[in-house]
Regions:
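N-terminal signal-anchor/signal peptide hydrophobic helix marking the start
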Residues: 10-16
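An internal, D/E-rich "acidic patch" concept
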Residues: 5, 68-130
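Hydrophobic alpha-helical transmembrane segments of membrane transport/permease proteins
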Residues: 20-77, 171, 176-198
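Membrane-water interface segments at the C-terminal ends of transmembrane alpha-helices
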Residues: 27-33, 151-184, 212-218
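Alpha-helical transmembrane segments of integral membrane proteins
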Residues: 2-7, 111-116, 120-144, 160, ...
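Residue-level signal for discrete positions within transmembrane alpha-helices
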Residues: 16, 110, 114, 150-153, ...
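Hydrophobic alpha-helical transmembrane segments of multi-pass integral membrane proteins
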Residues: 21-26, 75, 119-123, 166-167, ...
């Protein structure tokens, strides 16, 4: 089985690299074919200077930038020149957001903020959704189960942007119950503040963004957990376990839950990339300096090197989630036969 899993993993890695290459090629082609000139977008915000200085030097800078970004070459040549740099660990330099700065450095600066948000959101999602899904599954079609189902569908239907804005309007400064900070992720440290006070203020800054990132995943996972548990709980081996006199908690948690984990693992593969995608809106609304805000700046300024690096990161994260799910399958159920999948 180990040999079969190794072969399967190797095959998935090769397929993942090919998929990532196609994602990057498609993204580059779309950006190059989009209307407008990215070099002109990147020059917005530069000082206009005197009118005397100008048209020739502006045109010279524009031509120089086009050459640097390989925009003076055919699309396929431009992509392969960029990809050649990536293979040597060079993702290029930002053309607009932070001119001349390596995009890898920009991403590494913003990544810890987004990671902290997303890790907290994943923990909240799984720690809250799985118990609720199990609780609902062992009480099927009761009033409480129906109320939980209605609540979960209601949560799942809420748009992230609207929810974030409504939470700000109600719970932030100027709202009905101004408990949480309006923006940012870190408090303003006043001299004399204790460590506990700083920690408490930091947690308050995290509450609304983490809720916005996790509520949809929480609702979906709770429903998937309920469905998976209901499917397993009526199997013959569960009836046998009950007939042996095992306690209900042992039957549910030790036997039913373990077999229902496959469904939850499948959902995990999609949670990582969806959280990063949701970070774009959440970080924008709450003015959080993470990967989401960086993506918005890169899109609005058409910073091609930075956008390509972000696409590479997002694509790699999606494929890593799928690969991690495959590994978790083996841990959850060693009976899975990978030989047949090769």
């Amino acid at each position: 089985m180990k040999e079969g899993f190794t072969k399967y993993l190797f095959k998935r890695l090769l397929l993942g690299m090919l998929t990532l290459f196609i994602i990057l090629l498609s993204s580059y082609i779309l950006m190059r074919l989009a209307p407008g000139d990215p070099t002109k977008s990147s020059m917005l915000g530069e000082g206009a200077g005197t009118q005397l200085s100008s048209e020739k030097s502006a045109l010279a800078r524009n031509d120089s930038l086009r050459e640097k970004l390989h925009l003076d070459k055919p699309v396929y040549v431009g992509f392969f020149l960029w990809f050649k740099g990536v293979l040597h660990g060079d993702f290029g330099e930002s053309a607009a957001v932070d001119k001349g700065r390596p995009v890898a450095s920009l991403i590494l600066e913003k990544l810890p903020v987004t990671l902290s948000l997303n890790i907290l959101a994943i923990l909240v999602t799984y720690l809250c959704a799985i118990p609720l899904g199990i609780f609902s599954a062992v009480r099927p079609d009761t009033r409480l189960d129906n109320a939980i189902t209605f609540f979960l569908f209601f949560l799942y239907s809420l748009p992230v942007l609207w929810t974030a804005l409504m939470l700000q309007a109600v719970f932030c400064k100027g709202g009905w119950l101004p408990v949480f900070p309006l923006k940012g992720l870190f408090p303003e440290i006043v001299p004399g503040m204790s460590t506990w006070a700083i920690l408490g203020q930091t947690l308050l800054h995290y509450v609304l963004p983490v809720f916005c990132l996790s509520y949809a995943g929480f609702a979906g996972l709770a429903r998937f957990t309920r469905s998976g548990m209901l499917e397993v709980i009526h199997q013959d081996y569960i009836r046998t376990a009950r007939a042996k006199g095992l306690s209900e908690s042992s039957v549910v948690l030790k036997h039913a839950f373990r077999n229902a984990m496959i469904i939850m693992i499948t959902l995990f593969a999609g949670i990582l990339p969806s959280l990063v995608g949701g970070s774009i809106l959440v970080e924008y609304v709450f003015n959080i300096p993470g990967m989401g805000s960086l993506s918005m700046l890169a899109l609005s300024s058409r910073d091609i090197p930075l956008l390509m690096a972000l696409f590479a990161f997002g694509g790699a994260l999606t494929l890593a989630g799928i690969l991690l799910a495959d590994i978790l399958y083996v841990i959850a159920d060693p009976r899975i036969d990978f030989e047949s999948r090769i």
